[in-house]
Amino acid sequence: MNKSLNYLRHKNFAIYGLGVTGRSVIRYFDKNGMKNYVLWDDNKKVFKRFLGSKYRRMKSDFLESINFVDYIIVSPGININKTKLKKVLFKNKHKIITDLDLFYLLKPYLKSIVVTGTNGKSTTCKIIEHVLKKNHFKVNIGGNIGSPILNLNSKKNSLIVIEASSFQLAYSKFVKPDYALILNITKDHQDWHGSMNKYIESKFKIFSLQKKNNFAFINSKKLLKRFKKNKYASKLKFVAAEDYKKIKNKIENNYLNSESNQENMSFVYALSKILKIKEKPFIKSLKSFKGLNHRHEIFYKKNNKIFVNDSKATRFEASKFALKNNKNILWIV
């Protein structure tokens, strides 16, 4: 029997937010006999789907229960400082966790890689997954990419690759990755976090939760200074672009050799060395990587013209990486 699951069956939960994440939590609870929960969503149309069913919970029930529950699972993107339930949530802030926390509470035995940063998270996660699978690791991928984390059917010897947003990390308390990567930090989500400093703090939260035998990866001297100042327990791995450049010409993959992927690849290479993947099998595994849809995706070529779909880049900072890689550009926004 899963001792962690049995322990959590006797805890009381409040689920706030019934989007993809909230619904994945409900499914997991129902599947595993976890019946002690109330739920709510500010969006009446979303919440209405649960009325008249076994999930029926009124707002009054939610507000009355929230002071007595053990954990409040908040969906990513919900800012407790701006919600209608601000007062009661702030009072119970110490109880707030995310679906990532729940995953770690349920499966503390799993090894994990958490990738965060402003740009390149999804691509980096997929490259890591690809390299690990090609080198005979048992891998699952989830979080902000692919399936919600609680949907994963992870075996005891699996290595989990998780894409984590600043929203998730801001609330996290039990996420303890063996390997944590902060790819980059540029201005983003300040409307949610309140300031650039708080945004950076949310990213660095991942290092504060690590143990002394875990690894932390960064590539910026500015972030390095912050890491040393905070004296985190984990082992620091500074990602130097020069290390990857030494093998770049051996990699036969135009997608990965693009300027926009150099930072991502530097992290993947640094991680592969810590995981003791040798250089030759590492290079060989990258040959078959095809890239992600809508991320610097070449979908048509004609008369020396190349058509690139980069529609996943919804911010200028993200688009800038793709634009740097090309000349004579007609940029359609």
Predicted segments with their positions:
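Active-site regions of enzymes building and remodeling cell-envelope glycoconjugates
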Residues: F50-D61, K93-I96, L110, N157-S158, ...
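Beta-strand->loop->alpha-helix junctions that form or flank phosphate-binding loops
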Residues: V38-D41, D99-L102, A233-K246, I283-K287, ...
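Short, basic phosphate-binding NTP loop
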Residues: M1-V114, R295-E297
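Nucleotide phosphate-binding/pyrophosphate-handling subdomain across enzymes
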Residues: N2-N12, S24-Y28, N32, K138, ...
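Phosphate-binding loop of NTP-binding sites
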Residues: R27-D30, L63-N67, P76-A216, L224-A233, ...
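Residues in the short beta-alpha loop(s) of Rossmann-like NAD(P)-binding domains
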Residues: G19, D42-N43, I145, S220-K222
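Residue-level detector of alpha-helix initiation sites
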Residues: V20, N119-T123, Q262, A313
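Short internal beta-strands
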Residues: N36-D42, A216-S220, I332-V333
